């Protein structure tokens, strides 16, 4: 198994898979772990090229989804719930569309059928390869969090920004290129399993309008 993963919670409980956003690791879910493990077996993993998961060159959205299926197979999990944020949410949409038999339901947060635009992602991939992660880490707190949240939970902000700063530049760039090519706008209407859609009013990238499109 190429994915680094962590499994927490009571054996025999329903399994929920958590998928991280671009530039973070499965540690991003730590604040939710106590609440979720009260009722679920929680499976977290580091996405391709993130955290302790190795990078294997070019990656696509389909491969990100297939990684999840391979992980479920590796752990002999026939069916699970899934929750992903941003890139992890887009992965969840792919899974709901192309592997519905493996999931009871999917929750997607701060995501879209098409996140951003191709030129922006390709430009970001070039930038991190040339200049390192500092080029995207600068200003990340302002992009990711509202003023009120930064004041209320500075430790969460610091932890996630630390994950971004210490991400592998090539792994990050490869996922940027995957997002540049990923477009499920013509596919989400075919999703037949329940999907919970969560959006943030202050999110400038994956907007409420993007969430409404998924409806």
Named regions from a protein language model:
Residues 21-24, 86:
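Active-site glycine-rich loops that stabilize anionic/oxyanionic intermediates
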Residues 204-210:
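Conserved alpha/beta-hydrolase "acid-adjacent" motif
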């Amino acid at each position: 198994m190429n994915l680094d993963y962590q499994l927490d919670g009571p054996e025999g409980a329903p399994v929920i898979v958590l998928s991280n956003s671009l530039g973070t690791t499965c540690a991003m879910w730590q604040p939710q772990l106590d609440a979720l493990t009260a009722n679920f077996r929680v499976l977290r993993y580091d996405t391709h090229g993130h955290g302790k998961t190795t990078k294997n060159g070019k990656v696509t959205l389909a491969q990100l989804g297939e990684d999840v299926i391979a992980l479920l197979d590796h752990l002999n999990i026939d069916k699970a719930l899934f929750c992903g944020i941003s890139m992890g949410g887009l992965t969840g949409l792919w899974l709901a569309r192309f592997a519905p038999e493996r999931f009871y339901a999917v929750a997607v947060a701060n995501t879209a059928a098409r996140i951003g635009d191709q030129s922006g992602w390709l430009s970001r991939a070039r930038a991190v390869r040339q200049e390192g992660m500092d080029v995207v880490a600068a200003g990340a707190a302002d992009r990711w969090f509202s003023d009120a949240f930064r004041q209320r939970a500075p430790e969460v902000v610091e932890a996630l920004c630390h994950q971004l700063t210490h991400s592998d530049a090539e792994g990050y760039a490869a996922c940027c290129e995957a997002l540049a090519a990923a477009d499920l706008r013509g596919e989400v209407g075919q999703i037949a399993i329940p999907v919970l859609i969560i959006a943030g009013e202050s999110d400038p990238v994956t907007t409420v309008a993007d969430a409404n499109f998924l409806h």
